[in-house]
C-alpha cells in the first residue's frame, strides 16, 4: 500500500526534516513534496516509492491502517556490540 500524504508529513516531522531536507534526500522538487503533503497531488507510484524508501532508510517505519488509521514511528536504534 502506498504511503499517504499524512504519513509523509508525519515521517518528516518525526525526523525533524524540513521540506527542503526531504526534497534533497529524494531528488524531488520541494513543491512536489509540499503538494503531496497538503493533498494537492496524490503522487504517482514511483514518486511515492522514492519518498517511502528514503524515509525508511532514515529510520522511519510505516504503520498500515489497522483500525486506528495509518501512521509512522521511528525504529529503535540497535545496540552496538562492543
Regions inferred by a protein language model and the residue ranges of each:
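A charge-rich, low-complexity, intrinsically flexible signal that marks solvent-exposed coils, linkers
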Residues: 10, 25, 41-43, 63
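Helix-turn-helix/homeodomain-like alpha-helical modules used for DNA recognition
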Residues: 60-82
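Short basic helix-loop element that most often maps to the first helix and adjoining turn
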Residues: 6-21, 77, 81
